[in-house]
Amino acid sequence: LLDLDACIRCGRCQENCPAYYTGKKLNPKVTVIQAMKKHLDGKAPHLLSGAARPELAMTSDAEANAVSPLEASLLYDVVTPEVLWACTNCRACQEHCPMFIEHLNKIINMRRNLVMWQGDMPAEAQNAFTNLERNYNPWGVGWASRANWLEERGIRNLVNLLPEDHREFEYLLYGGCAVAFDDRYKRAGEALVRLLDRAGINFGYLGNEERCCGDPARRLGNEYLYQTLAAHNIETFKKYGADKIICICPHGYNTIKNEYLQ
């Protein structure tokens, strides 16, 4: 609520939103923060007064057909699904906001309602959820091939692959989905493995026991799926006694460091 009142309408969030500049319906200032504030301002007086149905001063036919503040739903009537699904989660709006308003949390929470309560989501999101549930990565590549990139890049002999090798290690390498299945990121993974080997750092890699960190599921609103993936990874970390983790994937780094603690 304080975020809504804190907005000074400077438009910096709007100016830096990539979705807005590509013609999407999302406008962090207008279609999210100010829309929610207008909804709150219109609804709160009637809730406080206990009025069953507010009397609206109608001045036109369009207004005569308008949904009353008490009947308006935050989702659909105020903030539409099209607006919510246009967000890329880049956080540019928050980075440039002088009032430190947290736009993204509001968008994710509303997505969570759409996904977990309404069952209303784009086909692409549903496909990603299915892939994460079955193969533990957003692309649906077979989970049993998660460690194949080591052989492809010729570095299998440099890696303490768990549980096959299970030698003592100081650090656990968390590769993430992109390193396992995307050709460009495989090269980045290879570079890091060779660097760690050259530096004499003793590390282990989970391979097929590793699963997606869950970040895509949480950002898309499927909190249950995120919790399931996170719980598995945490239990696996504990299983091998990993207390120092090196992340290649930036999403995995942020999720494991900042969100698994929650």
Predicted regions and their residues:
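Iron-sulfur-cluster electron-transfer modules
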Residues: 4, 30, 39-262
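Non-transmembrane accessory domains of multi-pass membrane transporters/channels
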Residues: 1-25
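Carboxylate/His-rich catalytic cores and anion/metal-binding grooves
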Residues: 17, 29, 33-35
